[in-house]
Structure formats: C-alpha cells, structure tokens
C-alpha cells in the first residue's frame, strides 16, 4: 500500500521520468494515464503492445509479436500459462532489441503476460495491475448452478493464477480496481496492492441535457418510460437471461414501457455455448418465451457519446453480474445520472448502497427486480435523488482525474524506491525451442 512506502519527495514536473507500460492491447487501462504523464508531467512514456507501431499523444507504442502458444497437445489446465510464457518471451525479445528503452519504472497488466522476464533487462521498480484472481468455488464458476462449470474448468482455475503469483511475488507494488478484486488475492500479498479504479472519463460519461426525448430517429413520447440494459455481450455471466425475464414482465404490466438493450450478440466470458448447443445466448434466451421485440429494442453496440445520451434519457437502468470483474457500463450509467437497479452481488455492493445511490435485488430474484422496477417506473422522479447521488459518487471518487492522480502518486513513490538487485546481462546464444 502507498502508506507502507517511505515519504520521499515526488518527482518534479521538470523531471523526465521514463515509464514503460506493458499490456496486450492499447490503450487499455494505461493509455489515458500515459498520455497525461507525457502532457502534464513531462515524462517519457513507452507502451509495449501487440498493436502499433505508433506515436499516440506523445506515447511511443512498441509492437511485439508472439511466435507461439498453446496447442491441442498442451494440457488444458496449463494452456493459459503456456500462452502467458510466450507473450512474456515476446516482450523480452522485443525490448532486448531496443537498448534505447531504459525505463525508470515498468507498469504491466498481470494476466495476458508477465513482466518478470523484463527484470533480466532492467533494474528499475515494477508495478503490476491485478485484475482477477481465479477460484474454483464461491466464484463466477459455480454461481449459476443451471450453467455449471465442467470438472476441468474448475481444475484449470487453480493453474490460471500461476503467472499472477509470479508477478505478485516479484513486483515492488501493485494495484487493483476495486477492494473486491484486491481481496481475491492471497492475503500475504494484499499489503503491497493498492485499490485504484481505472477512472471514468466524465467529459464523455455525464448527464447530457437534451431537448425532448429523442434518440436517433426514435422519439420517446412524454408518457413513455425507458428501461435500459448494457452489456458487451449477451451472456449468463451478465444476467442477460434474468434481465429478459424481468423486461418481459415489465412490458406486460406497463403498456407505455420501451426497453433499450445495448451490446453485441456474442459470448465474452464463460462457457454458455457448451450449455445451449450454439454460439448465440441471445437467440437461446429469445427462444424460451414470447417477447415483444417491437418494444424491446436491440440497438447493437453504440459509440460512447451515443450511449451517454441514451443513459441520460433512461428512467431505470438494470445491471446484473455474477461475482466477476465489474463492468464499466455500470459506472458509466452512474456517471450519466441513471437510476440503477442492480444485482446484489459482491462486486456491485462495493459501488451501490441500497436507498442511497441505487437499488439492489437478488441476482435470481425476478420477482424482486420486477417489484422494485415497478416502483421506479411508476414514480421515476421519486428516485432521482438516488441517481444524483450515484452521479456525484463517480465524479468525486471515480472520475478519470481523481483516479489518475492516485496512480501518479503511486508511480512516483514506487519510482523513488531504491533500485532492486541489478539485472543479469541479456543472455545470448541459442533461442528457446518451440
């Protein structure tokens, strides 16, 4: 934790500290911060990713190429680790060929790859971002008994953490977006892992004042109520099937209700395809009951400004998730001042306090969702204080400016720590087999 580091003077704005970010994707969680450090702090920032090369807002994006990975012959339980090693080797080989890259601090996402090989190149401190520590029980794998994880999926959960454990042991410090995510980590490592959220860009995600209630070519009549649901993919882990049951009953009870569903017809997480006999969980759900698709509108994927406008029009936004990484869509909806009714699951409870900044219902409690939704839809103005409190929470505690300032302080403190043991010389000779 930051409090455990010595109180050293932070780097002055004139100092060109060099930070190397490592993530499979760009910009991912680090892009906003890298651009800010370049512009406001005068830092040099490099970003190692599978995308590129490019110079984006002063940040050099360096591409790396993975030369191998797990195959059908690789044991199912070790494929994640095998892929991670190949990614980590590609990071090492790419930077070994760039002697001009001499960072003062390395910041990497622990998951797609490990930064531990880079310790053989650099003697600077390392910070890792820890997003999710897998567990076989009391987790996303066994939360939905109607869609049970297979035996080997449960066994694999233990080995999927292998590279995370390496990074937890080797890094000088780390951070996780929420307390719930941090507390999934083994207790022995938690003291050196801060809780710092990724940050919501409130210049985009904010309540948009609009004349009338028009979205695109769709005009929402004054006496209509608008219910919204957003998910990157339509799947059981985000409760799409539960939401559709709730939406159907609400449509039956409210002739003036319109439902807007945002997302793509794909499965991003979990093993839904194995249980439904096909790739489309949406089609499987729609085949279970009769839905009025003239009132339940599937809008596809929306650009952030359009989605912010839609959320600003919403009378009620429903969000569900199993115990898993919290969706940014919940935070975006809060930032836009939508009244939230969400599943009473651990990651959600960290953000939503019932009666203060939203409402909660049991994940499987369709009756509970319908009852509370009815109350909001009948008297939406009576619940506007919840929406306003949620909006203030995001702006005061989870906005990009607030979160990036916390990250800057962490980076400066860790970057000021004494250097670790100097690295070995970059090995030469035969390359690894594979």
Where are these regions (language model features)?
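Short hydrophobic beta-strand element within catalytic cores of glycosyltransferases
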Residues: 339-342
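Acceptor-binding helix/loop patch of EC 2.4 sugar-transfer enzymes
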Residues: 68-77, 124-162, 203, 207-208, ...
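Conserved acidic donor-binding segment of nucleotide-sugar-dependent glycosyltransferases
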Residues: 354-355, 359-366, 375-380
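Conserved donor-binding/catalytic core segment of Leloir-type glycosyltransferases
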Residues: 216-238, 244-249, 259-260
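N-terminal subdomain of nucleotide-sugar transferases
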Residues: 9-60, 65, 418, 424, ...
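Nucleotide-activated donor-binding/catalytic signature segment of Leloir-type glycosyltransferases, i.e.
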Residues: 267, 273-301, 305
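A short, well-ordered alpha-helix in the C-terminal region of glycosyltransferases
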Residues: 368, 375, 382-397, 403-409
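Aromatic "clamp/platform" in nucleotide-sugar-dependent glycosyltransferases that forms part
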Residues: 322
């Amino acid at each position: 934790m930051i409090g455990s580091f010595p109180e050293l003077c932070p780097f002055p704005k004139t100092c060109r500290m060099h930070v190397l970010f490592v993530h499979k994707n760009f910009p991912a969680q680090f892009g906003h911060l890298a651009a800010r450090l370049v512009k406001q702090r005068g830092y040099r920032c490099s970003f190692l990713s599978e995308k590129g090369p490019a110079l984006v807002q002063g940040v050099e994006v360096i591409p790396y190429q993975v030369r191998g990975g797990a195959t059908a012959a690789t044991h199912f339980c070790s494929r994640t680790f095998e892929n991670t090693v190949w990614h980590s080797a590609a990071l090492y080989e790419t930077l070994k060929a760039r002697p001009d890259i001499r960072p003062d601090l390395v910041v990497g996402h622990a998951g797609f790859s490990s930064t531990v090989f880079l310790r053989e190149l650099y003697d600077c401190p390392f910070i890792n971002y820890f997003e999710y520590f897998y567990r076989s029980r009391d987790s996303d794998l066994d939360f939905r008994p109607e869609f049970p994880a297979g035996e080997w999926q449960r066994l694999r959960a233990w080995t999927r953490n292998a590279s995370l454990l390496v990074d937890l042991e080797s890094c000088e410090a780390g951070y996780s977006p929420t307390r719930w995510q941090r507390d999934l980590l083994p207790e022995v490592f938690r003291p050196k892992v801060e809780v710092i959220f990724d940050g919501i860009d409130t210049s985009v995600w904010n309540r948009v004042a609009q004349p009338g209630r028009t979205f695109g070519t769709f005009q929402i009549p004054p006496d209509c109520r608008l219910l919204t649901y957003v998910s990157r993919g339509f799947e059981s882990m985000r409760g799409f099937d539960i939401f559709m049951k709730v939406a159907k009953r609400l449509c039956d009870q409210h002739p003036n209700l319109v439902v807007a569903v945002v997302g793509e017809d794909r499965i991003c997480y979990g093993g839904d395809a194995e249980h439904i006999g096909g790739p489309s969980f949406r089609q499987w759900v729609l085949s279970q009951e009769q839905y009025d698709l003239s009132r339940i509108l599937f809008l596809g994927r929306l650009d952030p400004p359009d989605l912010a406008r839609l959320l600003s029009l919403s009378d009620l936004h429903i969000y569900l998730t199993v115990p898993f990484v919290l969706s940014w869509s919940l935070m975006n909806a809060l930032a836009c001042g939508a009244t939230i009714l969400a599943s009473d699951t651990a990651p959600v409870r960290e953000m939503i306090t019932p009666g203060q900044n939203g409402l909660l219902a049991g994940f499987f409690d369709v009756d509970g969702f319908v009852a509370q939704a009815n109350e909001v839809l009948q008297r939406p103005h009576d619940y506007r204080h919840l929406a306003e409190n949620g909006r203030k929470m995001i702006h005061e505690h989870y906005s990009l400016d607030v979160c990036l300032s916390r990250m800057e302080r962490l980076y400066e403190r860790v970057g000021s720590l004494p250097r670790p043991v100097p690295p070995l010389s970059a090995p030469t000779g035969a390359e690894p087999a594979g």
